[in-house]
Amino acid sequence: MPGPAARSRARVYAEVNSLRSREYWDYEAHVPSWGNQDDYQLVRKLGRGKYSEVFEAINITNNERVVVKILKPVKKKKIKREVKILENLRGGTNIIKLIDTVKDPVSKTPALVFEYINNTDFKQLYQILTDFDIRFYMYELLKALDYCHSKGIMHRDVKPHNVMIDHQQKKLRLIDWGLAEFYHPAQEYNVRVASRYFKGPELLVDYQMYDYSLDMWSLGCMLASMIFRKEPFFHGQDNYDQLVRIAKVLGTDELYGYLKKYHIDLDPHFNDILGQHSRKRWENFIHSENRHLVSPEALDLLDKLLRYDHQQRLTAKEAMEHPYFYPVVKEQSQPCADNAVLSSGLTAAR
């Protein structure tokens, strides 16, 4: 009979929620105030997800362009969680701003109203990003993650679709907090979160005592896909195959070391599909099309993010201090620098 898995706790911000009043994290007791959706005129559909439909809209009281996320029938508890988290994070660095919570007067369907971001589809955008652009946007995303983690919240669905980028304005926002959750040490969480290609090994081996470091794996997957121009970087056909794809890069011996450390029992199905794989060098993924985006610092950062052992991954704050970001920090610390001009490289061209 397999024994219980070993306990684990976040290396940072572990006690944030226990130091706050219950009202901060007890989302089930939260009572959102719902305004009237009639103030918002839907303009066009932007997309749909598992839990919502998203529209561009106009606030007819002030002509402001907004995004309205109409929530599909889902447990009230989940809606309360998303609203409470968005309210707690309001005003945070690079976090999408919740403007209003409204209900359709007839159907009573709840909807969330957000600031509008003129996003470029990542499949097009990632093809044109320069080395500096990648460093810049990854740094901006880390600011958002360090902010939410410092507030005791794990995003749990970091992926390109949830990172809005207005490339003209060099503006990034982390969106879709529908899977986000409050971190409490030793709590066991649902592993059915995040999107397949961005799921950390802890989710794939059914280890429930995870923490903020889950988001750092997902960010590592994004970084890998950007610098190597391979989208997605780990391309599994299903959740089982996803771990196999990871093992083919990080190695099977290293995986077994991770499982042993945390007393994790692997699903027997893996016996048939995992095989034996050596750890690959990150340099193996460099080719003529991506060489200009890869540097020793990029590979070093990547190596410190894509670790099986969630406790070994860099935290968001540690990642921001990595040499890979020195050029960005240098630019952002320049007084009165026009970041948009600098980062587009126009100054160099003059």
From Swiss-Prot:
EC numbers for this chain: 2.7.11.1
Active site, renumbered: D157 (proton acceptor)
Class of the enzyme per the UniProt entry, highest EC level: transferase
Subcellular location: Nucleus; Cytoplasm
Binding site for ATP: L46, G47, R48, G49, K50, Y51, S52, E53, V54, K69
BP-aspect Gene Ontology terms: apoptotic process; DNA damage response; double-strand break repair; protein phosphorylation; regulation of chromosome separation; Wnt signaling pathway
A single cellular component GO annotation: protein kinase CK2 complex
Modified residues annotated as Phosphoserine in this record: S18, S21, S288
Chain positions found as N6-acetyllysine: K97
UniProt cross-references to InterPro entries, sorted A to Z: CK2_alpha, Kinase-like_dom_sf, Prot_kinase_dom, Protein_kinase_ATP_BS, Ser/Thr_kinase_AS
UniProt cross-references to CDD domains, sorted A to Z: STKc_CK2_alpha
Primary location class: nucleus
Residue numbers carrying Phosphotyrosine: Y13
Keyword S-adenosyl-L-methionine: no
Reaction(s) catalysed by this chain's protein: L-seryl-[protein] + ATP = O-phospho-L-seryl-[protein] + ADP + H(+); L-threonyl-[protein] + ATP = O-phospho-L-threonyl-[protein] + ADP + H(+)
Reported function: Catalytic subunit of a constitutively active serine/threonine-protein kinase complex that phosphorylates a large number of substrates containing acidic residues C-terminal to the phosphorylated serine or threonine. Regulates numerous cellular processes, such as cell cycle progression, apoptosis and transcription, as well as viral infection. May act as a regulatory node which integrates and coordinates numerous signals leading to an appropriate cellular response.
Name listed for the protein in its UniProt record: Casein kinase II subunit alpha'
